[in-house]
């Protein structure tokens, strides 16, 4: 059972933080967009991306965009899991999703504004030296990995399933977003294989020094194990003018956005134009015909 809580938080783009929490109610009047708001659909407890204290890097990037556009930044919060878009963007409770793949069929998207990949995270004093899937130290380590994530493909291809401790794709809301990196710190696992923004941010927050190593791209070996993805802003399909406006703000604030990513420890590499999920899927179908592989796993 998934329990979704909804709240609205108003954030003044230029005058600091003003918070007004209201419970969502059935039969509520549909919001009318008067053009003065930059209203973001976000998770209230999903660092490093967002939370209701405005501490996430997507919160900070949204502040930059709202200020550039001269709009009041507001939020509609909903846990980011099944039904997120249905209950937020598509219900017109908000207008902008700060992080999605650029060819998400449910959205109209901006050009990608950053690109990240999966990382290895391990203690600096562990004596381990891990740079890729063939590293000898990886073969003697307990590896924490999110089940069904793309990184499980190279893990399997390199005969490392016996080393794996799988974690659920959908986080238990009783656990903090840092739970996988926390298990490295506690010594429950030796290495975490995790999406870059999660690994980089929580490693930077850790009092225990951690090593963060970007995993080499695996797409050419097995497209289903693709490690790197472009990330865009998304709006409703019909919102052509809104996404054009947002694109202008993204273009004008590239340096500020990169600074935010760096401050949060988000591993990132140059955007690869034209890299998208459907291209990967088509390539995967070709490889499957040749190798009789399985379907592309869900991304994290």
Placement of each model-derived feature along the sequence:
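Bacterial N-terminal signal peptides
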Residues: 1-7
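Extended ligand-binding regions for polar small-molecule ligands
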Residues: 14-23, 29, 56-68, 126, ...
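Ligand-binding clefts/hinges and TM-proximal coupling segments of bilobed small-molecule sensing domains
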Residues: 14-23, 30, 150-171, 244-300
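Extracytoplasmic small-molecule ligand-binding "clamshell" domains
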Residues: 15-105, 173-174, 263-264
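Acidic, polar ligand-binding/catalytic clefts
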Residues: 18, 63, 67, 72-138, ...
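Periplasmic-binding protein-like
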Residues: 43-44, 115-127, 204-250, 267-292, ...
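Bilobed "Venus flytrap"/periplasmic-binding protein-like clamshell domains
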Residues: 44-48, 52-67, 120-176, 191, ...
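Alpha-to-beta junction loops
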Residues: 71-72, 90-99, 140-142, 179-180, ...
């Amino acid at each position: 059972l998934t329990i979704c809580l909804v709240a609205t938080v108003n954030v003044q783009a230029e005058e600091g933080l003003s918070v007004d929490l209201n419970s969502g109610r059935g039969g509520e009047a549909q919001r009318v967009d008067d053009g003065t708001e930059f209203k973001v659909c976000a998770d209230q407890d999903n660092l490093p991306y967002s939370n209701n204290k405005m501490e996430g890097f997507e919160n900070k990037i949204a502040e930059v965009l709202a200020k550039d556009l001269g709009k009041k930044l507001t939020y509609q919060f909903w846990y980011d899991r099944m039904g997120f878009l249905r209950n937020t963007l598509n219900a017109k409770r908000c207008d902008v999703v700060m992080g999605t793949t650029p060819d998400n069929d449910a959205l109209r998207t901006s050009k990608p504004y950053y690109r990240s990949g999966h990382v290895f995270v391990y203690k600096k004093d562990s004596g381990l030296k891990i740079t890729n899937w063939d590293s000898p130290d990886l073969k003697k380590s307990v590896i924490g990995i999110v089940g069904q994530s793309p990184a499980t493909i190279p893990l399997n291809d390199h005969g490392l399933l016996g080393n794996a401790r799988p974690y659920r794709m959908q986080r238990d809301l009783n656990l903090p977003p840092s739970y996988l990196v926390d298990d490295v710190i506690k010594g429950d696992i030796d290495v975490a294989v995790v999406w870059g923004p999660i690994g980089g941010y929580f490693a930077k927050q850790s009092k225990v020094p951690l090593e963060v190593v970007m995993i080499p791209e695996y797409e050419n070996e097995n497209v289903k194990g693709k490690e790197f993805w472009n990330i865009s802003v998304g709006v409703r399909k019909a919102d052509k003018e809104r996404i054009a406006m947002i694109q202008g703000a993204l273009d004008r604030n590239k340096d500020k956005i990169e600074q935010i990513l760096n401050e949060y420890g988000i591993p990132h590499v140059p955007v690869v134009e034209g890299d998208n999920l459907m291209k990967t899927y088509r390539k995967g179908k070709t490889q499957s015909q040749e190798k009789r592989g399985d379907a592309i796993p869900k991304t994290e």
